[in-house]
Amino acid sequence: MAPVARQANVPVIAFSNDRHVAGNGVYLLGFQVEPEVARVVGYVAQRGMRRFAALIADDALGKIAGANFRQEVARVGGTIVALQTYPPTANGVLEPMRAISTQIRSAQEGGAAIDALFVPGGQENLEIIGRLLPQAEIDTDKVKLIGTGGMDYPNAGRDAMLVGAWYPGPDPRGWNEFAQSYAKSYAQSPPRIASLAFDAVTLASALAGGGEDQRFTPAELTRAAGFTGVDGAFRLLPNGTTERALAILEVQQFGAGILDPPQSLGLAQPPASALSRAVNFD
């Protein structure tokens, strides 16, 4: 689709999070893992936690997360003490988890304990990891679990082993208001991707009021003022990726708690009442 749209000089707003398809008229609204890794590693390092272990799926997302994890740990002056990858199968993670556990215990016994265990991914692999943490004898009271935005799924807090984990994501209050309004109107919960669809419509609406020759031009799409949607402030960049204001969240038994509010992008934030009106489906 992108080549056809490019020939017609029509920009494409994609829900993808694969930055390899960004650019040349394609702009990604999806949450990209690279800034998420930078946000969570930076937050942890600010709290004096600089010795890391990582358990990463050997898949496309894992490769991106792993490469950026190495880069960000080096940037903050940290050390990756242990790193294991695992095949994305139901039973593939147990042996790598046991290996990580052994390395964590060895570091503790050697007087240089590991501070945080990085486990990027989403619900499918995190539920498996959560179930296996006790078998692998990894004590999450001593080693802080950290992840990416994939931890932001319903009922993550039902798994006691994931409670207390830290991850980056948008301020959940915008999504909660959106989901409540959606459920009231349609008697069902919205899929998580619905916020991206809503934000895409919001973006289009914001730009549609300009002069006909100015609508949806690269300059307007990447305007410094950015946009504000259900998932907070965001700015489209000339390379097709998206800069977002990400908070640091903590998995709690019921929902997520905000540990560190979204970092400012220098964009004006609308009052909560404005967002509430915007997501009214009645």
Model feature map: region roles:
Residues 1-282:
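Extracytosolic ligand-binding ectodomains
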